């Protein structure tokens, strides 16, 4: 589990390699990632947008921007949490993802919340020792 806290908003991410949806012989590897967004602060906030930077082991970078997450712009009151699962394919057996969410308070103030960097490692990734 990977976690990051920004301005009392805690982001937890748990990636899972999906062997049954991957085709390693065709350089196609798929991961699911489960995200929990916890509002540990005193303000009600709404998740407005997301940004992801996904880099595979070959250095290929894919950036994703868009409104909300999984078709929603969830409202989180103090003490509430929102969870969702999504996924990403890579053309290499490993990679890394990170990003941020744009949040907005009830007063209209917007701020970014960090999504922690997390590794995407399949059993097909070659391990390197230094």
From Swiss-Prot:
Residue ranges occupied by any ApaG domain in the UniProt entry: 3-127
Matching InterPro entries: ApaG_domain, ApaG_sf, Uncharacterised_ApaG
Short name of any one Pfam family annotated for the protein: DUF525
GO biological process: error-free translesion synthesis
Annotated SUPFAM superfamilies: ApaG-like
PROSITE patterns recorded: APAG
Record NCBIfam families: PRK05461.1
PANTHER family per record: F-BOX ONLY PROTEIN 3, POLYMERASE DELTA-INTERACTING PROTEIN 2
The protein's name in its UniProt record: Protein ApaG
Organism: Parvibaculum lavamentivorans (strain DS-1 / DSM 13023 / NCIMB 13966)
């Amino acid at each position: 589990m990977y976690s990051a806290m920004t301005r009392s908003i805690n982001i937890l991410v748990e990636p899972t390699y999906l062997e049954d949806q991957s085709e390693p012989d065709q350089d196609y590897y798929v991961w699911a990632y489960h995200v929990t967004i916890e509002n540990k602060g005193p303000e009600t906030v709404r998740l407005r947008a997301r940004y992801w930077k996904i880099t595979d082991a070959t250095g290929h970078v894919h950036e994703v921007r868009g409104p909300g997450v999984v078709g929603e712009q969830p409202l989180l009151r103090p003490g509430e949490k929102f969870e969702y699962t999504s996924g990403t394919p890579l053309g290499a057996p490993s990679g890394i993802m990170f990003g941020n969410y744009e949040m907005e308070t009830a007063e209209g103030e917007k701020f970014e919340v960090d999504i922690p960097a997390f590794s995407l490692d399949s059993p097909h990734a070659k391990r390197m020792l230094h």
